[in-house]
Design a protein with these regions (language model features):
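Ribokinase/PfkB-type carbohydrate-kinase core domain
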Residues: 1-42, 57-60, 64, 78-80, ...
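Alpha-helical scaffold segments in soluble metabolic enzymes
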Residues: 71-74, 230, 253, 304
């Protein structure tokens, strides 16, 4: 393919658990399979305490850079990651990532405890390791000349997650200032994650900075259905996953409001995207009732979307490839290769 991406700046170890609802013996127990069941258990406890037993499911790498970068790399994209993967050497959980991607590590990773259900997941993150990442730290780790070369070579630059990065704006502005004006189109890719964690004023400031730079560096913002609903509401629109309610037109309306080149929404049932260069597109996905793995699903969609874009595919094709990537991932708990998607 020959196209290159650089992803920065986070790094998580995901400790993934299931929650036991009842146990009759050592080997016989039932799990909470629906988030509503677990919520009911918590709510029914009232003002008292609640004791729960958790069952380890896996320990895995996580975060914007590792998940999206590795997903894209598995699909043939030349990928560089800058984040926190281990102080002296990558944590063993990132071994397969470092074998496929070029990795620069700023320190030890953050930790997320993930509680998986059939219909979703709860993520609880300890953020200390990623909250102090800043531009100077990145340049000091990579080296100024090497960092400038990385940016020059990149076709897509991803920064995330916005909601977990106090220095997002500073890093973004420094990257923009460092990019050469050589006629090559370089695209930014963002996944803000759950931006309800930060106030609306912070969101407005960051979006305004992205909008101001969009004419020089086209931007793609990807959100899930819950993030889309919050973003739509902030512009007085009701988000609906019913294709009969002109979801494509609504996506285009929001894209114009935020002033970015491309706006993508992904959900378990469909994906939709609006672009300044193409007509809005919609792609249904095959719903998976009992996914094997959900943590990292949205990132796998994004990795598939990035790979499809770098292959020169049209907007609808990009959505279909991204849907195929995440569909394979949640059913097999494996990031797909191109061969898996054929």
């Amino acid at each position: 393919m020959g196209k290159k991406i650089t992803m920065l700046a986070d790094g998580f170890v995901d400790e993934v658990w299931e929650i036991i609802s009842t146990r009759s013996s050592r080997d016989n127990f039932a799990l909470y399979t629906q988030m509503s069941q677990f919520a009911g258990r918590i709510a029914s406890s009232g003002t008292g305490g609640v004791g729960l037993e958790i069952l380890r499911k896996r320990r895995a790498f996580g975060g914007f850079t590792a998940n999206i970068g590795y997903a894209a790399a598995r699909l043939g994209v030349d990928t560089t990651l800058i984040g926190v993967y281990g102080k002296n050497k990558p944590d063993p959980v990132f071994e397969e990532v470092s074998e496929l991607c070029r990795v620069f590590s700023l320190g030890d990773p953050a930790t997320t405890h993930v509680f998986e259900f059939d219909d979703g997941k709860i993520l609880m993150s300890h953020m200390e390791a990623v909250q102090d990442i800043n531009w100077k730290q990145i340049v000091d780790c990579v080296g100024h000349s090497a960092m400038m070369a990385l940016l020059e070579e990149s076709d897509i630059i991803g920064i995330g997650y916005w909601s977990l990065m106090p220095s997002f704006d500073e890093i973004f502005e420094n990257i923009c200032a460092s990019l050469p004006q050589d006629g090559k189109e370089r695209r930014f890719f963002f996944d803000f994650a759950d931006f309800r964690k930060k106030d609306e004023a912070s969101l407005a400031i960051s979006l305004e900075k992205l909008k101001a730079a969009n004419s020089a560096f086209p931007m793609t913002l990807s959100v899930n259905e819950h993030e889309a609903a919050a973003l739509f509401a902030s512009y007085g629109e009701a988000f609906s996953d019913d294709p009969g309610r002109s979801i494509k037109e609504k996506a285009e309306y929001i894209r114009q409001k935020i002033g970015l080149d491309e706006f993508v929404i992904h959900s378990p049932e469909f994906a939709v995207a609006a672009s300044s260069r193409e007509r809005p597109a919609f792609a249904a996905s095959v719903f998976c009732e009992k996914p094997v793995r959900t943590a990292g699903a949205g990132d796998t969609f994004n990795g598939g979307y990035i790979a499809a874009r770098l292959e020169g595919k049209g907007l609808e094709e990009r959505l279909h490839m991204a849907n195929a990537a995440v569909g394979y991932f949640i059913r097999n708990a494996i990031f797909p290769t191109t061969g898996n998607l054929l």
